[in-house]
Design a protein with these regions (language model features):
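Conserved strand-helix element at the start of the C-terminal RecA-like helicase core
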Residues: 2-5, 106-135, 142
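SF2 helicase motor core recognition
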Residues: 8-20, 63, 127, 167-199, ...
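Residues immediately C-terminal
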Residues: 35-38, 67, 187
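Interdomain hinge/linker at the junction between the two RecA-like core domains of SF2 helicases
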Residues: 64-111
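Conserved SF2 helicase motif VI
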Residues: 206-233
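The feature captures the C-terminal accessory region of ATP-dependent helicases
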Residues: 252-407
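SF2 helicase catalytic motif II
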Residues: 5-8, 16-60
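Conserved helicase motor
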Residues: 4-10, 122-125, 141-165, 182-184
Length: 407
């Protein structure tokens, strides 16, 4: 019987009605077990069946991208870690592009495209903005969760319905020249295509930390979606030195201190001398971050703890490009080729020049600021910006070329 973790209680109910002894007569296999950790922060019910899972006499978990699990019941019940090692070259060649302006490279990839492209970006608004900015609405499809689908369709009704195709389920006939996939389609989903598309993953932490991709899980799972392979695999990413990069030991210590504080306040709460004191202590207890790491019963949710640690460790990699390089070099799943392209301007700078909601003075100041950073000889990206700026305000570009910044 195949079911989602959230629907497993229905199987138990049916088995009870039929007098079937599931725990002793059936084998329980949890597939894509990494999702128990990766998804528990927004799919709380995904780990509820685990108490039943441990009651099975015969059981196992499996994943192509496993995450170490800290729940003590695994050790208590003698679980073993079995690794299947291939005897052939299975690693994915990947181009890792570090930049401060992902949009330039997305535009370049689309401009040079000779085959369909699959973009994997964990922020639907980002996908939509790329599509609108490049004017590729009629050639694009977005595959996302139902709520995101409704939001995009609502946004389109507020303006002009520009023909973006938005779906919450994937089918091959819905594929387009440019295809954008949100996190809903990163794993547990197969694309069996007659052709091999180019695959582009985008992480723009300067725009949003929600675009962060875990190199050891998300990126591997994404590469595995194309069952017949792909033509090329690229990860375009930014970094941000403002992101904290804690060690695992520091995160574990933080959780322990939060737990100690929670237990202390809990003791005071249980022995509160009055309803007022109980309310104040209850509010204080609920504000403790540790409450997100326990079940309603008060028991520790080890999967939530693992999620907390994993999330911070993954996010911390995007503090510095060298950490990303190291993660890719240490990965067993990729053969990375590294590139770096730091531009004198970002996409946000370019939009100041382009959009109508900025004054002429603001636009001219930004154009001069950007042009002043260019060095001779101009590269193709510099030339592209100069051409765009010349189209928007030829006078200021000509003045800069003749007189320079100081004028």
């Amino acid at each position: 019987i195949m079911t989602t973790p959230e629907s497993l209680p229905k199987v138990f109910s049916a088995a009870e009605n039929l007098k079937i002894d599931l725990f002793n007569e059936w084998f329980c296999l949890m597939d894509e077990s990494h999702l128990l950790v990766k998804d528990v922060d927004y799919r709380e019910d995904i780990v509820l069946p685990m108490s039943s899972f441990f009651q099975f006499q015969n059981k196992a978990l499996v994943s192509a991208t496993p995450i170490e699990l800290s729940d003590p019941r695994f050790k208590e019940q003698g679980f073993e870690l079995l690794e299947v090692v291939a005897n052939y070259e299975y690693r994915y060649p990947i181009t890792v592009m570090h930049t401060n302006n992902p949009f330039i490279h997305i535009r370049e990839i689309i401009k040079k495209a000779e085959r369909p492209i699959c973009f994997f970006i964990n922020l639907v608004d980002y996908c939509y903005s790329v599509i609108k900015e490049l004017g590729i609405e009629n050639e694009s499809s977005i595959f996302c969760a139902p709520k995101s689908q409704m939001k995009i369709k609502h946004d389109m009704t507020l303006g002009e319905d520009n023909g973006v195709n938005v779906y919450d389920e994937w089918r091959e006939e819905r594929m387009n020249k440019y295809n954008f996939f949100s996190a809903r389609f990163f794993s547990a989903f197969d694309m069996d295509l007659e052709y091999k598309p180019d695959v582009v993953m985008v992480t723009d932490v300067k725009k949003s930390v929600y675009t962060i991709l875990d190199i050891n899980t998300d990126c591997v799972q994404i590469a595995g979606r194309l069952r017949r392979g792909f033509n090329s695999l690229t990860h375009i990413l930014t970094t941000d030195d403002a992101i904290a990069s804690p060690k695992q030991s520091e995160l574990e210590e933080t959780i322990k201190l939060q737990e100690n504080a929670y237990n202390y306040i809990r003791t005071l709460y249980d022995n509160a001398p009055s309803e007022i004191a109980k309310k104040i202590l209850g509010d204080t207890m609920r504000s403790n971050p540790f409450t997100k790491l326990i079940f309603p019963s008060g028991a520790k949710n080890y999967f939530a703890i693992d999620n907390y640690i994993n999330e911070y460790l993954v996010k911390g990699l995007y503090q510095d490009y060298e950490l990303i390089r190291e993660a890719y070099m240490n990965s067993d799943m990729f053969i990375p080729k590294f590139k770096e392209n730091i531009q004198p301007y970002t996409e946000e700078d370019r939009l100041v020049v382009k959009r109508a909601n900025y004054s002429v003075k603001q636009k001219r100041m930004k154009i001069v600021e950007i042009l002043s950073k260019f060095e001779l000889p101009y590269n193709e990206y510099d030339i592209a910006f100069i051409d765009e700026a010349r189209h928007i305000d030829p006078l200021i570009v000509e003045a800069f070329e003749l007189l320079g910044k100081e004028a």
